[in-house]
């Protein structure tokens, strides 16, 4: 699993043209922690995976290797739900 996560995080970051420092600036995840994720030395927490999925326009399931579909799930619009009632 670590190899899947590290490869996907690296590919997603490079596809966006971001450095690890840019990821830190956008998410607040410390660069050294993010580097450890890309090298398979630690896993992202659920909160970190959520931040990364938003930054990279993908799903948490894709980051964790649960699916091979990199497209993000549709985001729910809570205001839309309120308007329907």
Question: Where do the PLM segments sit?
Answer:
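DNA major-groove recognition helix of helix-turn-helix/homeodomain DNA-binding modules
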Residues: 28, 47-62
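Short, charged recognition helix plus adjacent turn
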Residues: 15, 64-85
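Short alpha-helical DNA-recognition segment
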Residues: 17-39
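Residues within the helices of the helix-turn-helix
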Residues: 10, 21, 50
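The alpha-helix within a helix-turn-helix
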Residues: 13, 24, 53
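Residue-level signal for the short linker/turn that defines the boundary of a DNA-recognition helix
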Residues: 7, 17-18, 44-47
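Residue-level recognition of specific faces of alpha-helices
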Residues: 8, 33-36, 48, 62
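A short, Lys/Arg-rich alpha-helix, primarily the initiator
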Residues: 1-15
